Amino acid sequence: MKFFKLLILCSSFSLAQRVDKDLEAFRKVESEVKNNLTEEIIKINDNFFMIKPIGGVAGNIGVFISDKGLVLVDDQWEIIEDLILETINSISKKDISFIINTHFHYDHVDGNKAFGKKGIPIISHENVRKRLKRKTKLYGHPQHNYKMIQDKYPDFALPTTVYNSTMKIYVEDEEIQLLNFGPGHTDGDTIVFFKNNNVIHAGDSFVTYGYPYVDLNDGGSFKGFINVLNQIVAISNDETKIIPGHGAVCDIGDVIKLKNVLQEHYEITEKGFSQSLS
């Protein structure tokens, strides 16, 4: 009996070590965010602001102000909750009405763990909730060469409302469109279009750091990524302000440039495969 107790104890210790090792890369990024990240406020118009992170891996937050409260698009990290709230309060003292997740990656939605505890509603594509409910392997990101493990989220941090392809939310005179155009960056991306303000938050379906990350392990598609960019262009005009997942506020021309580069690369690669080139 003592032998079996010892065996169970050793097995449990080994499992704990493996779990800690799995999350080592995540904890490293989290620590860098805690120690280095600052926030910059970018005013888009009187009702809309972007919170742009500097010095750490985190996504841009969109902040829409209505008389009834604030709508956030993405919420960065739980570990910098105080910094996020301080930054939001410098924009507006209103309460947060609800949060929209653009996709499930940690640098955009880890803040769910902080805001979900407060009972703030969270809205996302249905696949975001599914993926947050389990541990996920992320790899191949251009900003790091290690495998990243994203642990499963507690129930209180999961989206409370989900949709499949499209959803409309009306806040006073603003029509907020949640649009999923199929697999792209992941299989659960949301393009958030604030129609009357003419502002789009694209999440990581559009970025400015260079060649985008397509999460093939979680339903992403390179061809689909190009399609999503085409769809963003289709709902935009010359006055549309486009918030990328990472980087400065952009316009339709920036999206077209990235789309053209990716389309060219895709066609070259496809031609190579058809000719059995390596």
Predicted regions and their residues:
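Active-site metal-binding motif and surrounding structural segment of the metallo-beta-lactamase
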Residues: 67-71, 79-124
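Conserved beta-strand hairpin/beta-sheet module of binuclear metal-dependent hydrolase folds
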Residues: 42-88, 192-204
